Regions:
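Cys-dependent condensing catalytic cores that perform Claisen condensation/acyl-transfer
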Residues: 2-4, 29-254
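Heptad-repeat coiled-coil/leucine-zipper oligomerization helices
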Residues: 5, 9-12, 16-19, 26, ...
Length: 254
């Protein structure tokens, strides 16, 4: 390509032609970036049916397992809240759903979190820490080394645990807000893993995880980050949301 001295020797018409070609080349380069493939290099997950890694999720899917179960007793007493009539106040008309096992289990020491802080942490934040670590390991990375220019895009839309914690006024402490605040869910990942890229939480209801992946792809193509962690988490721990959905006829009876 011509340098500045070469350009000075060109006629105005040739200089304009050169600049147009250079501008076109830059535009084409930008357009190529917008359609460049993005590699999925690692996964971490928890799904109903005991799926805790990509291999077990594939087994659940390939075997066509039905992961819908009756609402576990450690969530709430379904007999107390069930009524087949959707108009009954304070009741839900379904006894079933898709639930994860052992959502109260968490190795706080591994993540450098005190027992006191871990108690006030929403289990959704705990799950995000675990699966993010596993995703990086699955990608062949060493999470403890940290990665600069890595974005975090997390979908969240419900915080049953936060309502429980804040509902006990005498038990509210310095960790109660950070343990249940949506924005902290992404920030905690970035801080713990030593990441310096974009870090955000998105709430678009049922589409949240897809939107998080979409935003991650946009950020990668814009050059805001070189690697991105994207996903979502949703735990139903108390009956209120099911009661609300029942009143809106959003739940299948089976």
């Amino acid at each position: 390509m011509a340098n500045e001295l070469d350009l000075q020797t060109l006629s105005p018409a040739k200089r304009a032609l050169y600049e147009l070609r250079a501008a076109r080349a830059r535009i084409e380069a930008l357009e190529r970036v917008q359609h460049e493939p993005i590699a999925l290099i690692g996964m971490g997950l928890r799904f109903p049916g005991g799926a805790s890694d990509p291999a077990s999720l594939w087994r659940v899917l390939s075997e066509g397992q039905d992961t819908i179960t009756e609402i576990p007793a450690d969530r709430w007493d379904i007999e107390q809240y069930f009524d087949a009539d959707p108009e009954t106040p304070g009741k839900m008309y379904t006894k079933h759903g898709a639930f994860l096992d052992n959502v109260d289990g968490f190795d706080a020491r591994f993540f450098g979190i005190s027992p006191r802080e871990a108690t006030t942490m929403d289990p959704q934040q705990r799950l995000l820490l675990e699966v993010a670590w596993e995703a990086l390991e699955h990608a062949g990375e060493r999470p403890e080394q940290g990665r600069s220019a890595t974005g975090v895009f997390v979908a969240l839309s419900n915080s049953d645990y936060g309502r429980l914690v804040m509902g006990q006024q005498d038990e509210i402490d310095v960790y109660s807000s950070t343990g249940s605040n949506f924005s902290v869910a992404a920030g905690r990942l970035s801080y713990f893993l030593g990441l310096s890229g974009p870090s955000m939480v998105v709430d678009s209801a049922c589409s949240g995880s897809l939107v998080a992946v979409h935003l991650a792809c946009q950020s990668l193509r814009a050059g805001e980050c070189r690697v991105a962690l994207a996903g979502g988490v949703n735990l139903i721990l108390t009956p209120e949301i099911n009661i609300n959905f029942s009143k809106a006829r959003m739940m299948a009876k089976d």
